[in-house]
């Protein structure tokens, strides 16, 4: 009885640690690699946002995506 409880507790602990690691990596990939692009008009047009994002990322040769929320947000991936 005691061994099965310890085994169950060990497996549960490993599962929680691995789960937190996977969720942390996903958040780190999206959250830290996004930045805002401001336009003179103050309005975000999706096509202009995508073009501006690709222009900003052209020099370091990164792949990214621009999308509109309230402002143009550019996220890139390595």
Swiss-Prot record:
InterPro entries: DEFL. One of its GO terms (biological process) is killing of cells of another organism. Disulfide bonds join 34-75, 44-68, 49-72, 53-74. Residues 1-24 form the signal peptide. The keyword Signal applies. It is found in: Secreted. The keyword Nucleotidyltransferase does not apply. It comes from the Eukaryota. Keywords: Antimicrobial, Disulfide bond, Fungicide, Plant defense, Secreted, Signal. GO terms for cellular component: extracellular region. Belongs to the DEFL family. This is Putative defensin-like protein 133. It comes from Arabidopsis thaliana. The gene is LCR33.
């Amino acid at each position: 009885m005691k061994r099965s409880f310890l085994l169950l507790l060990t497996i549960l602990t490993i599962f929680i640690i691995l789960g937190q690691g996977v969720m942390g990596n996903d958040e780190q990939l999206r959250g830290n690699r996004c930045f805002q692009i401001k336009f003179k008009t103050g309005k975000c047009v999706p096509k202009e946002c995508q073009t501006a994002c690709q222009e900003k990322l052209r020099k370091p040769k990164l792949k990214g995506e621009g999308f509109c929320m309230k402002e143009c947000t550019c996220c890139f991936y390595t």
